[in-house]
Regions:
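Core beta-strand elements of the Rossmann-like FAD/NAD(P) dinucleotide-binding domain
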Residues: 23-26, 117-127
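Glycine-rich beta-alpha-beta "Rossmann" dinucleotide-binding loop(s) and their flanking helix/strand
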Residues: 2-12, 119-121, 128, 132-155
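Rossmann-like dinucleotide/flavin-binding elements
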Residues: 19-54, 58, 148, 154-176
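Short, flexible, glycine/charge-rich loop motifs used to bind or transfer phosphoryl groups or to couple energy/partner
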Residues: 17-19, 61, 105, 118-119, ...
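N-terminal Rossmann-like dinucleotide/flavin-binding domain of flavoprotein oxidoreductases
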Residues: 2-9, 63-122
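Short glycine-/acidic-enriched loop or helix-start segments at secondary-structure transitions
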Residues: 40, 63, 108, 139-141, ...
Length: 176
């Protein structure tokens, strides 16, 4: 008697993502491109659930983060490097994928959710996972954008160790 315990999760090195189809009704539709959205995509794909993911940009805030020292498994990793790892992991699965678009509207047609994107196309799904993340509250002062990640940061607890022994200014964003 022979047993075959091979489990093909589609974890090869090639990209298997597909384009979104207006003719499909997806089991699940993920909105967002950060760590939560990427994790949801991996879990859905591993369970064989037909899904799609749309994002303004892959990585979310992580992509705008210079250095990360509090992500398990890495003593230090640059944000863009971590985003690349997220993207590579998700793209190993057959998931419908679209980047650089935003959701404009979600409405119901019976039990089906209709998701209208900024490119004008509408997609249908039985469920929607909203993992849209958040964004930093900016001060809109001269030089802020240019110095983001090189002196201007938005998380004192996260980035404080990078500035040990330096003179700094902490400015509240009014969102605490």
């Amino acid at each position: 008697m022979d047993f075959n315990f091979n489990l093909d999760l589609g974890l090869g090195t090639e990209t298997k993502t597909t384009e979104l189809s207006v003719n499909e009704i997806y089991e699940s539709f993920i909105i967002g491109g950060g760590p939560a959205a990427m994790t949801a995509a991996v879990y859905l794909m591993r369970k064989g659930i037909k899904a799609a993911i749309v994002a303004g940009k892959i990585g979310g805030q992580v992509g705008d983060t210079k250095g990360i020292e509090n992500y398990m498994g890495y003593n230090y990793i640059e944000g863009d490097e971590l985003v690349s790892k997220f993207s590579n992991q998700v793209r190993q699965f057959e998931i419908a994928f679209k980047e650089y678009v935003f959701v404009e509207n979600i409405h119901l047609e019976g039990d089906i959710k209709v998701i209208k994107l900024s490119d004008g196309f509408e997609y249908r799904s039985k469920t929607v996972i909203i993992a849209a993340g958040s964004k930093w509250r900016q001060l809109n002062v001269p030089g802020e954008e240019k110095l983001r990640g090189r002196g201007v940061c938005y998380c004192a607890i996260c980035d404080g160790p990078f500035f040990k022994g330096l003179d700094i200014a902490v400015i509240g964003g009014g969102n605490s």
